[in-house]
Amino acid sequence: MFRINNNDFKILQKYKSFLMNLDNSLENIPRKDIYLKDRIKNISLDVLKDILLCSYDTSSVKMYGTSIKANIALLDFMLERLLLKKYISEKNLYKLANELVEINKMVTGWLNNSESKFVWFTSYIWDWSKEKC
């Protein structure tokens, strides 16, 4: 099992920073919408878990990457709901959304990079097997 060093893993660092900002933003949600607050926290922790799983199991990057991107889109929608209910300011939403966009771009690049390595590896095996015959 291969593990990426967490200090060198920029996506993880960026996402941890996003989580800290998100926690500060969720403090203003009233008790009547505790479900929304808990759901946002759970989804954001699922993204963190998937990022960590990708760093430990690089063979499943595509599967976890798809989950990360879907959960980021869901977080974006839920943050918009917070703005509509006036629990966060437009400035705060803009800051959080920009961080999510940057994280999403990093994940997309990571997925594209891992796919190109997989294509290279499978074509290398295919070429090697042709030479043996």
Positions of the model-derived regions?
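Amphipathic alpha-helical assembly/interaction segments
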Residues: 1-133
